[in-house]
């Protein structure tokens, strides 16, 4: 007997993530719907996450919920903690929680790689929420973000991969979905390098089972 088909809604802050998450959902034989609002992250980076921005975020999540998904994933690590608290009638998941849980289960020195500064504190806080004694070490790679914004995705993943290779850690967390393409250049590393999209989709499917 076939398992029921789940519809997963995604709120993104960059168009590039639509293809990534669509492919992961299609692999599992489910449906997806996407809403992209780049201004949410742009304003968070420029001004921080205040009440007005949180209200806008929750409004966009309600728009997405009106499409009828069974579960929603916010794929922006800067904002996903606020998305979890939207209080919608469907579950709203943060993209990086399953990854964080896996990282603290591995333990040791956890290096957090991010190319957007506003992602660092939320990811650190999430790891410490998962394990209060986690040894979290921030490893920003902020100069690479200009490559992403310019559309130089190959240069971006090369820069991220080169940065990851300099780190001394027991597990490395790629704190943004945009960092995932760098994984293809890091297959020879013996240290686990974790990313969020695949585990987030698995968690979303499980949430509706």
Predicted regions and their residues:
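Non-catalytic structural scaffold of enzyme domains
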Residues: 1-209
